[in-house]
């Protein structure tokens, strides 16, 4: 679904560099996680090819745990996950009844697809697509009920691209859930305190102190509940 026409200055590889030094050895590891009564088997393909997309990060686990503890209702909802990596968040949403599109850069899609096949039964509504922020988000509809992202706020040059993508994808009555490790050196505070509130009503839904992860909930300004104010 991704557009093949890109500006050389905005090629995904130039904006989302693979951190080849993070995983110099190539190997696969399968881990099991339990959320909402589902046992998920997630394969992580470590190596320089995938880099940070290879592993299940703390923010993804925190977001899955939040969905379980808050009994977030995915039934019949149109859902999209950004920067999915292993796909664990989108897979859980699909198992909980969502009609889910799981996205990342093309290099990560094979890993996601393998995990979808391993966890989502035939007939489950989970599709895997390439999506490069700021380049081809308009290939996707702009009426998602839920937009999900876990640990996708860590490269400041991508922030404007992510904002534009969120603004397009989130439907007028939709909700965005973003879980993020709050790394000061990666600009997370700037994104959530200054940039995102310019376009959305934002609230801190949960703070996981042990792993330094915040979970934020955002909605378009014009449809936010009465009396709600931007997070500051």
Swiss-Prot record:
One of its GO terms (cellular component) is chromosome. It catalyses: L-lysyl-[protein] + 3 S-adenosyl-L-methionine = N(6),N(6),N(6)-trimethyl-L-lysyl-[protein] + 3 S-adenosyl-L-homocysteine + 3 H(+); L-lysyl-[protein] + S-adenosyl-L-methionine = N(6)-methyl-L-lysyl-[protein] + S-adenosyl-L-homocysteine + H(+); N(6)-methyl-L-lysyl-[protein] + S-adenosyl-L-methionine = N(6),N(6)-dimethyl-L-lysyl-[protein] + S-adenosyl-L-homocysteine + H(+); N(6),N(6)-dimethyl-L-lysyl-[protein] + S-adenosyl-L-methionine = N(6),N(6),N(6)-trimethyl-L-lysyl-[protein] + S-adenosyl-L-homocysteine + H(+). This is EEF1A lysine methyltransferase 3. Protein-lysine methyltransferase that selectively mono-, di- and trimethylates 'Lys-165' of the translation elongation factors EEF1A1 and EEF1A2 in an aminoacyl-tRNA and GTP-dependent manner. EEF1A1 methylation by EEF1AKMT3 is dynamic as well as inducible by stress conditions, such as ER-stress, and plays a regulatory role on mRNA translation. The keyword Transferase applies. InterPro entries: Methyltransf_16, SAM-dependent_MTases_sf. Belongs to the methyltransferase superfamily. METTL21 family. Its main location: cytoplasm. It is an enzyme of class 2 (transferase). Its EC number is 2.1.1.-. Keywords: Cytoplasm, Cytoskeleton, Methyltransferase, S-adenosyl-L-methionine, Transferase.
């Amino acid at each position: 679904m991704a557009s093949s026409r890109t500006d050389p200055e905005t090629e995904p590889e130039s904006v989302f560099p693979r951190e080849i030094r993070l995983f110099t050895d190539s190997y696969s590891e399968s881990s099991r996680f339990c959320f909402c009564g589902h046992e998920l088997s997630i394969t992580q393909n470590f190596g320089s090819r995938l880099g940070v997309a290879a592993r299940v990060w703390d923010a993804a686990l925190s977001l899955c745990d939040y969905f379980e503890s808050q009994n977030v209702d995915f039934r019949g909802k149109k859902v999209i996950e950004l920067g999915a990596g292993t796909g664990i968040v989108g897979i859980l949403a699909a198992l909980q009844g969502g009609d889910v599109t799981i996205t990342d850069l093309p290099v990560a899609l094979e890993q996601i697809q393998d995990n979808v096949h391993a966890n989502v039964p035939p007939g489950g509504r989970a599709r895997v697509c390439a999506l490069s922020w700021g380049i081809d988000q308009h290939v996707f509809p702009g009426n998602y009920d839920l937009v999900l992202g876990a640990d996708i706020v860590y490269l400041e040059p991508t922030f404007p691209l992510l904002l534009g993508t969120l603004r397009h994808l989130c439907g007028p009555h939709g909700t965005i859930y973003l879980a993020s490790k709050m790394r000061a050196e990666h600009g997370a505070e700037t994104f959530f305190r200054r940039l995102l509130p310019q376009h959305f009503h934002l609230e801190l839904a949960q703070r996981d102190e042990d792993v330094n992860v915040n979970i934020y909930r955002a909605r378009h300004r014009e449809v936010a509940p009465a009396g709600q104010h931007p997070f500051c």
